[in-house]
């Protein structure tokens, strides 16, 4: 049975121009904050889609909080359109690259994290963090497994890798269980 995997965060980056006047952009955009002594970029929060955009003087833009790449693209195009209408020279429909996706799912059981921590590529320090960290090399992702059975997969570039990673982890846990019990 296919696990129900839900994307909870997509981080993308793009280039919207060069030499952006962040003070001017902050005046134009609603919900924008620019405090260069605190952070070198302009932070703009949108409610629809619900994302945060970080715009840097170099023209680099990062968007975080989207539930899918399409939402990030909508948000970026919305901001670019607003800034262009105010006279800024920016790139139309900039190419957007997924940097990271985070997905969640359930194991469907409460795993013994101490047993799993005997496997290679795992870290488990319950005094520091309640989840077991499992680093896969193929696909290159990090899987966090919690005692409740909740699983968080991070470092994804495409959603298909979440299914591949979950399948690998499930098989490994099944083999470990057969070996131990």
Curated annotation (Swiss-Prot):
Sequence repeats lie at residues 7-83, 98-173. This is TATA-box-binding protein. Belongs to the TBP family. The keyword tRNA processing does not apply. It comes from Methanococcus maripaludis (strain DSM 14266 / JCM 13030 / NBRC 101832 / S2 / LL). General factor that plays a role in the activation of archaeal genes transcribed by RNA polymerase. Binds specifically to the TATA box promoter element which lies close to the position of transcription initiation. Coiled coil: none annotated. Keywords: DNA-binding, Repeat, Transcription, Transcription regulation. It comes from the Archaea. GO terms for molecular function: DNA binding; DNA-binding transcription factor activity. Pfam families: TBP. Gene3D superfamilies: TATA-Binding Protein. GO terms for biological process: DNA-templated transcription initiation. The keyword Repeat applies.
């Amino acid at each position: 049975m296919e696990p129900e995997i839900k994307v909870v965060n997509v981080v993308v980056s793009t280039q919207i121009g060069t030499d952006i006047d962040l003070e001017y952009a902050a005046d134009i955009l609603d919900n924008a904050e620019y405090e260069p002594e605190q952070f070198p970029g302009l932070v703009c929060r949108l409610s629809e889609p619900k994302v945060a955009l970080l715009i840097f003087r170099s023209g680099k833009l990062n968007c975080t909080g989207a539930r899918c790449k399409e939402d990030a693209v909508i948000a970026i195009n919305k901001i670019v359109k607003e800034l262009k209408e105010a006279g800024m020279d920016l790139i139309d429909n900039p190419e957007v690259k997924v940097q990271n996706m985070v997905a969640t799912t359930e194991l469907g059981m409460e795993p013994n994290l101490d047993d799993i921590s005997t496997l290679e590529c795992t870290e488990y320090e319950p005094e520091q963090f309640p989840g077991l960290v499992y680093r896969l090399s193929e696909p290159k992702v990090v899987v966090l497994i919690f005692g409740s059975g909740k699983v968080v997969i991070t470092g994804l570039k495409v959603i298909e890798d979440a299914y591949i990673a979950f399948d690998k982890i499930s098989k490994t846990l099944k083999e470990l269980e057969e070996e131990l019990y």
